[in-house]
Design a protein with these regions (language model features):
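S-adenosyl-L-methionine
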Residues: 3, 18-53, 84-117
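Bacterial N-terminal signal peptides
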Residues: 6-16
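Conserved class I S-adenosyl-L-methionine
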Residues: 52-61
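Glycine-rich SAM-binding Motif I of class I
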Residues: 63-67
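Conserved SAM-binding motif I beta-strand of class I
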Residues: 76-81
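A short SAM/SAH-binding and catalytic strip from SAM-dependent methyltransferases
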Residues: 116-132
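C-terminal substrate-binding/active-site "lid" region of AdoMet-derived donor-dependent transferases
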Residues: 128-176
Length: 176
């Protein structure tokens, strides 16, 4: 009995450890490293999120940014994530937060995803990924706000920068 309990606990602890901090297959520069809640909220504040917004989180991990956007600001949220285990975790988190009717999580490639509905796009992605995403982000509707946790987009200076504890968050507005 004790062996079964230890084995079960070991497996339960191993799954999140396997997801967290490991590169996804075929994507050596994409890691799941969750944004702290305080930083996620500061990102949404910097973007000026309201109930009229549709917040897309690229590489949404456990879904915390769309969930906070829905819970605290009344916005609709969309998480785009390639890892099906994290999508399942996101739906569980949304149900726990009682905002599953205001958010969606889809398995998708952020380079192929349709972002046309977004009024706010958030990301915590490496500089190389941000650089590759830049043309897609620049093509969004004028006025769309893009907020990055920590990473810049080379050649596109942010409109605002804000320090939150040890992290920097950056805001761009798609020009007209």
């Amino acid at each position: 009995m004790a062996t079964r309990v230890i084995l079960t606990l070991s497996l339960l602890l191993a799954v999140p450890a396997a997801i967290r901090g490991q590169a996804l297959a075929g994507t050596p520069d994409i890691f799941f490293n969750p944004t702290r809640h305080a930083i996620a909220d500061a990102m949404l504040q910097l973007a000026g999120v309201t109930a009229q917004d549709v917040v897309y989180d690229l590489g949404s991990g456990d879904g915390r940014i769309p969930i906070i956007a829905a819970q605290k600001y009344g916005a609709r949220g969309m998480g785009i994530e390639i890892n099906p285990n994290l999508i399942a975790q996101s739906w569980g988190n949304a149900n726990d937060a009682e905002v599953a009717n205001r958010v969606r999580f889809i398995k998708g490639d952020l380079f192929e995803a349709d972002l046309s509905e977004a009024t706010v796009v958030t990301a915590y992605l490496s500089p190389s990924i941000m650089k590759r995403l830049m043309p897609k982000l620049r093509a969004l509707a004028p006025g769309t706000r893009i907020v990055s946790h920590q990473f810049d987009m080379p050649g596109w200076p942010p409109d605002e920068r804000r320090q939150v504890d040890e992290a920097e968050i950056l805001l761009w507005r798609v020009p007209k």
